[in-house]
Amino acid sequence: MKAKEFITEGLNHPIICVDVQPEYSGMNDGDENSVFPEIIDFVNKQTGPVLMFVNAEDQGLSGDSVQSIKQYWDDTICPEDERYTYNDETEDYDENPDCPKINWQRFTIVDKGYGYFRAWMDHGIEPATIIATIRELYQQKKSDSRELQFPASNQRTPQQSLIMGAMQEMEDDPISVNWTSVSQLKRFNGAYIVGGARDQCLREVELLMSAFNVKYKRIDRLVYT
């Protein structure tokens, strides 16, 4: 989606933001990807709700905590050396009223971890088969693809046969769908989606949304690889 296409939609549009955090920004290596500040600035200038997926310490999958991610966003919007000015009269530091702030009440932050579809994605299982498997998991009320049950081979639908083939091929790497709420995703139907990585965690979120016909608009210039 191009910038000019969302200008007319208003600032209150919902946003899904995936993995915009220090660990993936390059800042820890002294080489921050320029798209990260652009994403943060864009999200902060909007006024609608934000569903923010992160990989944080709750899942043990990155060196970031939710608090350090929020601090990274705050510092990006207004660096610490600009946030306060020294007051000679009080001999203390005053908060700069012109420094922009992030309204964290707009945000729902989900520490999702990662890798729930990645083995299948990286192995080259077709997206349509992954989506069909996700739908089957919810229909059977299962969270792990190894728990799926199907009728005998002569009674299966072609789609069920494709799922079974993928399950057998990926026997040691199941799909898991217990990492987020589908009802929560549905509340963000039509949302802008930003972040990344394009073919990794962001793509996992897109596949889950597609499985339940939840629409989204990817802003390509605000997606990192």
What are these regions (language model features)?
Residues 2-144, 152, 206-218:
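Active-site acidic carboxylates
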Residues 22, 115, 197-199, 222-224:
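Short acidic/polar capping segments at secondary-structure boundaries
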Residues 24-34, 161-171, 188-194:
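Surface-exposed cleft-lining segments at the edges of enzyme active sites
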Residues 35-39, 175-181, 202:
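Amphipathic coiled-coil/heptad-repeat helices and related helical stalk/stem segments
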Residues 58, 164, 185-212:
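Catalytic cysteine-centered active loop of the rhodanese-like fold, especially the PTP/DSP P-loop
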Residues 117-187:
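Alpha-helical scaffold elements lining the catalytic groove of polysaccharide deacetylases
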Residues 192-196, 214-225:
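A short glycine-rich beta-strand->turn/loop micro-motif centered on a GG-aromatic cluster
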